[in-house]
Structures are given as C-alpha cells and as structure tokens.
Amino acid sequence: EMCIRDSIYIDDSSGLTPTEVRSRARRIAREHGGIGLIMIDYLQLMRVPALSDNRTLEIAEISRSLKALAKELNVPVVALSQLNRSLEQRADKRPVNSDLRESGSIEQDADLIMFIYRDEVYHENSDLKGIAEIIIGKQRNGPIGTVRLTFNGQWSRFDNYAGPQYDDE
C-alpha cells in the first residue's frame, strides 16, 4: 500500500526484495523528478528468494543491492538493522559495528554506521538519565566517535545537549 502526502512516499509492503524496492524507487523518481531519501525499516525483513537457504548470502545481496540503488539514483539509502543479542552479555552495552545482525556485508557496504545508545535503558540508576549517545561506528569520509544528545522520552525527541560532551569534561 502506498501513501503519498507532502512528497513523502510510504510503502509498507512486507518482505520486499531488493529488485522490488529498486523498481518502485525508479518509478517514483521518474514520476516525481527524483528522490531525496530512501529508508528501509528494517533490512532483515527484506528477502531474496533465490538465496533464502543461506541467510548470510541473502543479507549480503540485499546490502549490495541497496548500495547499488543509492549510486544509481544518487540518493542516500538509510537501512535500519537489528543488533545481535551478544551486546547483552557485555558490561558496556554500547553497540559496536560487529553487533549488527548478520553484519559482515552490512559493515563492508555501509558508508556510515550509526547507533543510538541510552544508558538508562540498561542501568536503572544511571547518572545519564535523559541523555542519548549517537555512536558513529563507521564513516567512510569522516571521523568516528560519539555525540551526546538530550532525550525527551515524553515526546520521543532528541535535542542538542547543553552539558559536557564527554565524561572527562
């Protein structure tokens, strides 16, 4: 089902293949003079029927196809991804690139990998309540690191953080 409103096109079809996403994106770009952004929520819900017996190869094909689509249409593709549960076993729960579920090809193909971390999710008595961290795990053309934001849970909103950006400030 396609919802078109104020130049935002939402397709909530489930289990799309990269070929179907590419076809729909091309059509929208042709009919509306381009696309500003493609967002996939989330990558692991996509399928490649010919590779369905090997999930690693399937995710690799999905990742490569989305990268090719970004280049073809000259548009950023934001693909949301699940994390492995392995981070639950670590003392520091901040995600790292290898925590991306079926991560090898995603990590390789991505130009930018970002995570959102909120300490209060894992530690009830955290000193960092109301603070979120944007962790830049990979940036092909720039630095990696962490940026703090204020998180307003009532509105699910992130704002500029006015306090110290790092623990040692």
Language-model segment annotations:
Residues 27, 35-80:
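Helical hairpin unit composed of two closely spaced alpha helices linked by a short loop
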Residues 9-11, 15-18, 22-35, 64-74, ...:
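C-terminal regions of RecA-like/P-loop NTPase motor modules
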Residues 2-4:
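Short, small-residue-biased leader/transition segments that mark boundaries at the very start
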